[in-house]
């Protein structure tokens, strides 16, 4: 069991919530680290997303993080990474999710350069089905990008990290926006209200990158790129 509050990195063999045995770190993001774990209660492998220490003192963020994860747990769909559990163990806040063996769409695009229209269409259909399922439950992703889309070894496409972006405070947005700003909707760039249409815009940018191998707007910093989404016209992918 975890004994020290704010453990910066979980060690192999640690047990979370007297149930999930940490087997190793498999990824990291702006706000959380991801570990492969064994669920000893249901005897299956899972992914455990653990909040980074710098966000564990932000009580407003913690509250939103939990409520959004609980909302996302309602979603069960073949094109969504399903959430199984959420909680905290002695100050370590975690989300337990379906473990997907595969790579992100971002990694796949980087490897291939750009995708054929046929392949991009197949991926796009699966992503849109996952988003439609979420939107029909009133859940908006708010951070749709290739890094949050996973392609499993058997070719199934799944959208990950529902609700986590919404929980982010302005402080966490600044930290994690480096990869996200290229896919941000104009209303998000403006700092205004965003809804399901924001996801569709970000999904459109993702589709653009699939067929061209690049994002439509580049810049020296996040502000420059965000302004481009507000003010500039996207060049047709050809």
What is each residue range found by the language model?
Residues 123-124:
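Activation segment signature within eukaryotic-like protein kinase domains
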Residues 127-139:
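Protein kinase catalytic-loop region centered on the HRD/HxD motif
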Residues 86:
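Activation-segment/catalytic-loop signature of the eukaryotic protein kinase fold
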Residues 22-29, 34:
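Protein kinase glycine-rich loop
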Residues 182-238:
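C-terminal lobe helix-coil module of Hanks-type protein kinase domains
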Residues 52-74:
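AlphaC helix of the eukaryotic protein kinase fold
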Residues 90-104, 108:
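Conserved short submotifs of the Hanks-type protein kinase catalytic core
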């Amino acid at each position: 069991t975890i004994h020290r509050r704010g453990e910066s990195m979980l060690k192999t063999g640690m047990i979370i919530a007297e149930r999930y045995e940490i087997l190793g770190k498999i990824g990291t993001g702006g706000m959380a680290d991801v570990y492969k774990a064994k669920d000893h209660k249901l005897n299956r492998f899972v992914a455990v997303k653990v909040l980074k220490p710098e966000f564990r003192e932000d009580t407003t963020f913690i509250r939103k993080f939990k409520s959004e994860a609980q909302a996302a747990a309602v979603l069960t769909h073949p094109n969504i990474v399903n959430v199984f559990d959420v909680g905290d163990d002695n100050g370590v806040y975690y989300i337990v999710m379906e473990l997907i063996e595969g790579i992100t769409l971002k990694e796949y695009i980087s490897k291939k350069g750009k995708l054929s229209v046929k392949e991009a269409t197949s991926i796009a259909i699966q992503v849109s089905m996952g988003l439609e399922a979420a939107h029909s439950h009133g859940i908006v992703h708010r951070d749709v990008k290739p890094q949050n889309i996973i392609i499993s070894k058997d070719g199934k496409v799944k959208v990950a990290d529902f609700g986590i972006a919404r929980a982010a405070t302005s402080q966490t947005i600044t930290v994690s926006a480096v990869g996200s700003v290229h896919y941000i909707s104009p209303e998000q760039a403006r700092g205004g209200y965003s809804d399901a249409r924001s996801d569709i815009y970000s999904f459109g940018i993702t589709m653009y990158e699939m067929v061209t191998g690049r994002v439509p707007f580049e810049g020296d910093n996040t502000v420059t790129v965000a302004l481009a989404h507000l003010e500039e016209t996207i060049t047709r992918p050809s």
